[in-house]
């Protein structure tokens, strides 16, 4: 079982840790073609699309859980139908985004309220990026399906190749074709469509044998569609809670001062790095728990829960020790601003608590995605999010920015605790 978990987790971790590279390259490119407004436009535009795509991450999660269960039942016709269903819905939503682009981009930029010189550049960036929406959401369906099929290597290969294509295309368009923010955006769009095309090709290469199973009937029957949308509705609402907490965390820091915002952003990077590793084991939990749950093998299912929790504890302890030992030296790798590093000392130990407090939330999220218990996931996240806001507003007058960190640490802990209680009472 340990080997199966690592076989699924490691490729996902490799994919995750390459994600920041793209943002760094985009910023580096525009940093050489204009002033700070270009960098601001890329930051605003990419944040807008990141939030939108994050909200529709249910396409990956819902597909992963249902596919792994169908695989466990050895219902290969349904496995095929799930892919067609997810791809159709993902690409369809992407086309709706394209049709509504003026309204979406206008509202998004209004809500983010960047300075006037940034707004026009960000709008130009977004109007190019929107062409990639069908590819991004279609690839979400493919990625979830591959994970459900116990294959995280194909998503890793697609992700790494996308990154390379994005970098090369952006460099060529900006420095050879003399495009500016549109060049960076078009490089991203080219990479997104390349990723979808590559997923289609790899599917044909590795899963051609599934063509012998008849899947063309009942693809869009009302009952499976109702289940698909019911599951994804709960995951969507859960994601809204996650986005609300994360956006509020940033906004609350900015209201304190620019220095506190910088400190919070720096320390949240420690959480982000930890999450790249834990997401890998969450994906493994999705795939394996769904497969054994679908097969009705409760012994193997409980073993998956036990083993992924053990790996989670190991990763959490490892990162906690790394942060304690590294301390200020670790922060100096992320910034050279001595003022920010010094100010971080007052809040550093809150960030150290994040791995141990957040570990169980990652693992149980993966398990509950795999067994498609979306209502339980929504319940845990809603309770934790409500607690986050209540704690912050009650304690902020007394503790200041410490209240924000205390609320966030307890929010992570509570998500895992609620899911653990549900698992013990209903699933064990």
Language model: regions and residue ranges:
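Helix-terminus/linker motif at the lipid-water interface of multi-pass membrane proteins
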Residues: 21-40, 109-116, 172-179, 240-273, ...
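Short alpha-helical transmembrane segments in multi-pass integral membrane proteins
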Residues: 1-9, 67-134, 165, 174-236, ...
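Small-residue-rich hydrophobic transmembrane alpha-helices
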Residues: 39-99, 136-155, 263-325, 359-372, ...
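N-terminal transmembrane alpha-helices
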Residues: 1-33, 47-62, 66, 91-98, ...
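Interfacial/gating helices of multi-pass transporter permease domains
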Residues: 30-50, 82, 117-121, 181-182, ...
């Amino acid at each position: 079982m340990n080997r199966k978990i690592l076989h699924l987790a490691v490729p996902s971790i490799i994919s995750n840790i390459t994600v920041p590279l793209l943002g760094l390259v985009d910023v580096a490119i525009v940093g050489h073609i204009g002033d700070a407004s270009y960098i601001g436009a890329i930051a605003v535009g990419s944040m807008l699309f990141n939030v939108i795509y994050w909200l529709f991450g249910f396409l990956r999660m819902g597909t992963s859980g249902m596919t792994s269960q169908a695989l466990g039942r050895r219902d290969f016709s349904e496995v095929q139908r799930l892919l067609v269903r997810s791809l159709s819905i993902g690409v369809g939503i992407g086309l709706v985004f394209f049709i509504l682009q003026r309204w979406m981009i206008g509202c998004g930029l209004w809500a983010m309220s960047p300075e006037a010189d940034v707004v026009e550049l960000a709008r130009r960036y977004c109007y190019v990026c929107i062409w990639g929406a069908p590819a991004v959401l279609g690839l979400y369906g493919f990625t979830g399906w591959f994970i459900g099929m116990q294959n995280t290597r194909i998503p890793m290969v697609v992700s790494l190749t996308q990154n390379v294509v994005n970098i090369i295309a952006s460099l060529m368009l900006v420095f050879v074709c003399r495009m500016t923010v549109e060049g960076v955006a078009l490089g991203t769009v080219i990479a997104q469509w390349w990723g979808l095309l590559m997923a289609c090709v790899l599917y044909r290469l590795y899963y051609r044998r599934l063509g012998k199973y008849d899947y063309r009937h009942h693809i869009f029957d009302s009952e499976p569609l109702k289940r698909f949308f019911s599951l994804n509705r709960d995951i969507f609402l859960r994601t809204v809670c996650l986005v609300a907490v994360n956006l509020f965390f940033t906004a609350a820091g900015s209201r304190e001062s620019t220095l506190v915002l910088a400190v919070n952003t720096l320390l949240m990077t420690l959480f982000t790095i930890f999450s790249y590793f834990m997401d890998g084991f969450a994906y493994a939990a999705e795939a394996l728990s769904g497969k054994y749950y679908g097969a009705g093998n409760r012994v193997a299912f409980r073993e998956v829960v036990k083993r992924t929790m053990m790996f989670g504890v190991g990763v959490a302890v490892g990162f906690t020790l790394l942060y304690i030992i590294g301390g200020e030296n670790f922060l100096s790798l992320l910034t050279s601003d001595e003022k920010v590093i010094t100010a971080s000392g007052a809040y550093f130990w809150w960030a150290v608590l994040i791995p141990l407090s957040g570990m169980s939330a990652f693992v149980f999220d993966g398990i509950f995605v795999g067994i498609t218990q979306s209502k339980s996931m929504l319940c845990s996240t809603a309770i934790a999010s409500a607690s986050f806001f209540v704690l912050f507003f009650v304690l902020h007058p007394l503790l200041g920015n410490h209240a924000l960190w205390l609320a966030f640490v307890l929010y992570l802990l509570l998500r895992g605790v609620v899911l653990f209680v549900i698992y013990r009472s209903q699933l064990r």
